[in-house]
């Protein structure tokens, strides 16, 4: 049973100058220590890595908020410290059934787009609610697919905070809407991602309705979006009527992601010739329609056609297929060491990020913190990180010529490149750093904890 009392304070909104200053941060810490209420937070997610938002948030809270302990609660723990979600014995037997259901879904919908993720969240994993209730606040992150059963969330007798890292929570099951607006009308109609035969075209609407009923039964649920763009998208959906939605950016560790002391030494170690203009980009997304990686070879070919020869391409991540580039390239492979990743960002002059839909873009935050400006498209929440003409250059979505022109401008204008790099570092420290984002989350947890009480 839930008894709701008046909230004790206001949720910190983005852009408040007091949180961008040391004074505002110090006031929050002192008030928190003087009257500690919310002590333990569980960050619930399918799995995490050292580069994922749940891990970084938990790390930021533990390092910068005295008296608060954040613990990762994961379906798959892997090498990251944390706890595993306790599954109920009865639900362990449903693992095989879930796999068969997913296979049957593909058989029923042979035209479904395989290059875009779609999660059913049917027969999700049952979990031990008593384990969740050891926390003061339960913070949900990547819980789609088989991580937890949404219908069971209402049984957790603790206030829930849910960060939406993509569009999954407010759609029938797709994670990237790619300009589809059906989620505004309960996903009724012919879903462009599923390509369902007429007989099965009601599946998205049924999935949407099922998910909305599950969320509607949760007594205490506060939504967090990592960008203003996603906040507006969630408000357009009818999935969460009347729910509080707060915008708080994802954090980046600006002590870790910072300019390297000797960039030339890193370049030499990578075999990059002295004096080359280095363009970095992600190799993993080259064939992902959401990441827009197909623009990368097109941009490079046009730069070559325009006479630029002293360029070097630095790739991060696993490249699924061989691609011919007009310039020498170095592929650093899949990086798990964040110190090494920071060094790679520092080795580059610019980061080419042609994503076509992104909530915020962690790679933009990381490169910016390392004083490496991004050239990117105006899409999703990316322009909130890459401020056009201040911390990077932003082209209209899909405009190849403008993206090439932006790259060419930075190749030719070293003074502008340096200005963007300096301002980008300041923007990262003032807006996305661990202390700033940890303070905003701590304030939200405290308000959520005080606003709701659960009677045993």
Would you name each region that the model predicts?
Residues 155, 168, 184-224, 238-241:
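Membrane-proximal helix-turn-helix segments that form the acceptor-binding/catalytic region
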Residues 373-376, 386:
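Short hydrophobic beta-strand element within catalytic cores of glycosyltransferases
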Residues 356:
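Aromatic "clamp/platform" in nucleotide-sugar-dependent glycosyltransferases that forms part
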Residues 388-389, 393-400, 409-415:
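Conserved acidic donor-binding segment of nucleotide-sugar-dependent glycosyltransferases
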Residues 310, 317-342, 350:
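Nucleotide-activated donor-binding/catalytic signature segment of Leloir-type glycosyltransferases, i.e.
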Residues 229, 251:
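Carbohydrate-associated surface elements
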Residues 402, 409, 416-431, 437-443, ...:
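A short, well-ordered alpha-helix in the C-terminal region of glycosyltransferases
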Residues 272-291, 297-300:
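Conserved donor-binding/catalytic core segment of Leloir-type glycosyltransferases
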């Amino acid at each position: 049973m839930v008894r709701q009392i008046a909230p004790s304070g206001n949720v910190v909104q983005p852009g408040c100058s007091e949180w961008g200053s040391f004074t505002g941060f110090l006031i929050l810490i002192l008030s928190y220590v003087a009257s500690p209420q919310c002590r333990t937070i569980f960050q619930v997610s399918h799995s995490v890595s050292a580069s994922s938002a749940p891990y970084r948030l938990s790390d930021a809270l533990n390092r910068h908020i005295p008296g608060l302990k954040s613990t990762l609660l994961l379906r798959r723990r892997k090498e990251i410290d944390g706890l595993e979600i306790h599954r109920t014995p009865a639900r362990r037997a449903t693992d095989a059934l879930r796999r068969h259901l997913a296979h049957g879904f593909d058989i029923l919908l042979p035209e479904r787009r395989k290059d875009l993720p779609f999660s059913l969240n049917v027969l999700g994993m049952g979990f031990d609610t008593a384990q969740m209730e050891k926390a003061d606040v339960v913070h949900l992150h990547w819980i789609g697919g088989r991580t937890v059963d949404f219908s069971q969330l209402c049984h957790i007798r603790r206030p829930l905070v849910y960060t939406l890292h993509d569009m999954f929570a407010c759609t029938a099951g797709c994670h990237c809407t790619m300009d589809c607006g059906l989620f505004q009308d309960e996903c009724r109609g012919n879903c462009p991602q599923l390509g369902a035969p007429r007989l099965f075209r009601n599946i998205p609407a049924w999935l949407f309705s099922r998910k909305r009923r599950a969320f509607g039964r949760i007594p205490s649920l506060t939504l967090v979006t990592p960008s203003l763009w996603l906040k507006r998208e969630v408000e357009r959906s009818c999935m969460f009527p009347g729910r509080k939605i707060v915008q708080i950016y994802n954090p980046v560790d600006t002590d870790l992601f910072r300019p390297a002391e000797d960039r030339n030494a890193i370049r030499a170690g990578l075999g990059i010739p002295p004096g080359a203009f280095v363009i970095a980009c992600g190799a993993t997304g080259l064939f992902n329609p959401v990441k827009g990686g197909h623009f990368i070879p097109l941009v490079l070919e046009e730069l070559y056609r325009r006479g630029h020869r002293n360029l070097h391409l630095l790739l991060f991540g696993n490249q699924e297929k061989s691609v011919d580039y007009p310039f020498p390239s170095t592929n650093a492979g899949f990086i798990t060491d964040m110190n090494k990743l920071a060094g790679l960002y520092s080795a580059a002059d610019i980061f080419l990020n042609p994503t076509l839909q992104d909530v915020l873009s962690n790679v933009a935050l990381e490169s910016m913190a390392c004083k490496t400006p991004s050239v990117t498209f105006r899409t999703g929440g990316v322009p909130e990180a890459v401020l056009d003409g201040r911390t990077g250059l932003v082209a209209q979505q899909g405009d190849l010529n403008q993206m090439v022109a932006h790259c060419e401008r930075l190749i030719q204008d070293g003074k502008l490149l340096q200005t963007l790099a300096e301002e980008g570092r300041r923007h990262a420290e003032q807006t996305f750093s661990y202390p700033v984002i940890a303070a905003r989350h701590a304030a939200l947890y405290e308000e959520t904890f005080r606003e709701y009480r659960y009677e045993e």
